[in-house]
Regions:
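Substrate-binding pocket helix/loop in short-chain dehydrogenase/reductase
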Residues: 97-98, 102-110, 215
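Alpha-helical segment proximal to the catalytic Tyr-Lys
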Residues: 126, 170-174, 243
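Canonical Rossmann dinucleotide-binding motif of NAD(H)/NADP(H)-dependent dehydrogenases/reductases
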Residues: 5-36
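C-terminal substrate-recognition "lid" of short-chain dehydrogenase/reductases
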Residues: 80, 118, 223-252, 257
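Short, small/polar-rich loop/turn modules that mediate ligand/substrate recognition or access, typified
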Residues: 173-180, 245-247
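Residue(s) in the substrate-gating loop at a strand-loop-helix junction
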Residues: 141
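Active-site helix of classical SDR
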Residues: 121, 157, 165
Length: 258
């Protein structure tokens, strides 16, 4: 699948080495974009950049560090020209109810999922407003809309990402910047994160099939989502096709929030 839906775009994708971030990078390049893969997983990031060829660049990025965000933007712009698109995809999930999860784990989750998205938006707006505008896509979650008792920290972080998206979108519109900011909310997508839960379930005595069925069963469509399906939604929000959409929420959840 290839085309020109992202022709002329330069996109920085945090968490770009795996999962939805990697799937989005592949779709973007297939549609004509140049991509900067920001991640702490150097081996995976470099391998993906090599696979994507001259249209991709890997940069080491800890989303909790503002100077690393600025360095990633600078490296990308030096290689490909002005940034037009930012995808805040880096994330972590540590399961636990309010009685089980500790403050250190809670703060770690928020530091990556919320602080990282905040810094991405902050640095991204500064980069995009000086050019011809562009698009920012944040990755939320169904659990940031509905909550999940065993995902206390993750739900809190993603609920905050949803509201952060709206605040940044309104600011950009009110300031006259041609920058759209939207949020994509995935359900259970079959990525490395879900595979981590599968491994934990197996270690606890469950079968692989039972764990996957457990995740799939919460969706009315009774299956896990594919990374490519989530990436297609990110592509739409990042492309000019969504030119009159800002501050919005797009769900890819098999009917979970219906």
């Amino acid at each position: 699948m290839s085309g020109t839906r992202m022709a002329g775009k330069v996109a920085l994708i945090s968490g770009g080495a795996s999962g939805i971030g990697a799937a989005s990078a592949k779709r973007f390049v297939a549609e004509g974009a140049k991509v900067i893969l920001g991640d702490m997983q150097a081996d995976k990031g470099q391998a993906l950049a090599k696979e994507l060829g001259s249209n991709a660049l890997f940069v080491s990025l800890d989303v909790r560090e503002e100077d690393q965000w600025q360095a990633a933007v600078s490296a990308g712009q030096e290689r490909f020209g002005p940034l037009t698109t930012l995808i805040n995809c880096a994330g972590v999930s540590i399961p636990g109810t309010i009685e089980e999860i500790g403050l250190v784990q809670f703060r770690h989750t928020l530091a990556i999922n919320l602080d990282g998205t905040f810094l991405g938006c902050k640095v991204g707006v500064e980069a995009l407003k000086g050019g011809k505008g562009g698009a920012i896509v944040n990755i939320g979650s169904t659990l940031g809309n509905r909550g999940g008792s065993i995902f206390t920290a993750y739900s809190a972080s993603k609920g905050a990402v949803k509201m952060l998206t709206k605040a940044v979108a309104l600011h950009c519109a009110e300031a006259g910047y041609d920058i759209r900011v939207n949020c994509m909310h995935p359900g259970a997508i079959h990525t490395e994160m879900v595979e981590g839960y599968v491994a934990a379930g197996i270690a606890a005595g469950a079968t692989r099939e039972a764990v996957i069925e457990g995740f799939a069963s919460v969706h009315p469509m009774k299956r896990l989502g594919k990374p490519e399906e989530a990436a297609n939604a990110v592509l739409f929000l990042a492309s000019d096709e969504s030119g009159f959409t800002t501050g919005g929420d797009l769900t890819v959840d098999g009917g979970y929030l219906a």
